[in-house]
């Protein structure tokens, strides 16, 4: 498999508080990597650093043999290849569903209005949101908003998609519709890094699971290894809390 991303010795501090400590891992084309761990373990900060929404304090992020953590790299160009779906959707409330999925294509990728529209319609249909293209975000449910956010990210035709707890802000009955879209993307070979508390998704859909604790990668491996035969006591304790919840 061809390598897309390589994270080398990545650290991130906010003031004196070190949130990420010497993180190393690689992402290959077609990987679905679930990042699990307790709140405050650094999972979301890791994704934000990978997407350059946060500037790493130290370390390197190699994307297709280029260190994008280098200050000379333009973040918006890199982000068109590595998309992100946020917990809180981050849709533009004053724009329709369709326009939300067009604006990035036109501004960043310089696509024509018609090309952006056709591409947006394709991905909105893919996530089941074609009937709502003229709605504003306030007129649709949380699950529908997240499906629009996924379509918006896909419309940029990224090589990698980052998901930051995409279901944690949703009512329980809406979680399934978002996870099903993500499962379909995995089946189609989309490369994904997913910060999640959805353990069934991590176990059933991922090909690799990364367990983080206190800013470090404590354990990683196949879902069968991490869930079925964890090596570290911290991992065992974390998974036991979920099983007993």
Can you name each region flagged by the protein language model?
Residues 3-223:
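ABC family nucleotide-binding domain
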């Amino acid at each position: 498999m061809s390598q897309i991303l390589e994270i080398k010795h990545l650290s991130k501090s906010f003031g004196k508080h070190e949130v990420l400590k010497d993180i190393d891992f690689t992402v290959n084309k077609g990987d679905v990597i679930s990042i699990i761990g307790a709140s405050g373990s650094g999972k979301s900060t890791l994704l934000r650093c990978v997407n350059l929404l946060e500037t790493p304090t130290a370390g390197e992020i190699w994307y297709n043999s280029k260190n994008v953590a280098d200050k000379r790299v333009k973040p918006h160009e890199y982000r068109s290849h590595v998309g992100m779906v946020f917990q809180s959707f981050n849709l533009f409330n004053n724009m329709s569903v369709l326009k939300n999925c067009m604006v990035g294509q036109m501004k960043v990728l310089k696509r024509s209005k018609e090309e952006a529209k056709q591409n947006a319609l394709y991905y909105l249909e893919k996530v089941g949101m074609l009937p709502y293209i003229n709605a504003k975000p306030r007129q649709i449910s949380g699950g529908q908003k997240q499906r629009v956010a996924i379509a918006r990210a896909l419309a940029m035709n990224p090589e990698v998609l980052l998901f930051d707890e995409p279901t944690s802000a949703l009512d329980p009955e809406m979680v399934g519709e978002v996870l099903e879209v993500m499962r379909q993307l995995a089946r189609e070979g989309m490369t994904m890094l997913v910060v999640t508390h959805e353990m069934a998704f991590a176990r059933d859909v991922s090909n690799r699971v990364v367990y983080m604790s206190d800013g470090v990668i404590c354990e990683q491996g196949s879902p069968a290894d991490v869930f079925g035969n964890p090596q570290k006591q911290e991992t065992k304790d974390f998974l036991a809390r979920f099983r007993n919840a």
